[in-house]
Amino acid sequence: VIWTVSTDVGRIVVREQLEPDDEPGILELFAACDDWFEAVNGTPSGPGDVQSLFYALPEGTSFDDKRLFTVRDGDKIVGLIDVVLGFPHRTAAAVGLFLVAPSHRGRGLGAAVANVLLAEAREGGIDTVTASAHDTWPQGQTFLRALGFTVGPPAEPSGNRVSGPGEAPVRRATLTLQP
């Protein structure tokens, strides 16, 4: 599925599905977003972070539940969104990563893309969306609250993901989608 989203930075394309040719662009995005990786994980990004996109899943979900979206400005990948459908319950979706390149932050791109994907989720029968909210990345919590999420207390790690050495606790942010 491909969406074209009008934003303050121009027309952005959101694509559901990664291609093998996307890996260099994702590595470049991750390197550009080392501020986020260092704040959240305590270390810069690395090739293992790209690989974990495909393998990190909450308990009780399968690879068929995983959705990875790229956000593109022309040919350049400027964002990545990692979603697991059916978690924490059948009609929910969990956002594990919503990453926007520093060059495109603070200009409405994230909100425009999120609103398109939230509308698609609502139309697809999703009634709850959860997201990870890190105390060490307060702008992420501000973004989630602006979208209408409620940010809860720190939570324990779940699923098959191993926390990094400098990783701070994560809070679950929750948004109830109205039909």
Language-model features: where?
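Short, Lys/Arg-rich nucleic-acid/phosphate-binding segment
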Residues: 88, 155-157
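Acetyl-CoA-dependent GNAT
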Residues: 2-103, 114-116, 120, 124, ...
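Conserved GNAT acetyl-CoA-binding A-motif
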Residues: 121-133
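Glycine-rich phosphate-binding loop
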Residues: 108
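Conserved beta-strand-loop-alpha-helix junction that forms the acyl-donor binding cleft
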Residues: 105, 131-141, 159
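Conserved active-site alpha-helix within GNAT-family acetyltransferase domains
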Residues: 111, 135-153
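Terminal substrate-recognition subdomain of acyl/acetyltransferases
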Residues: 1-7, 132, 157-179
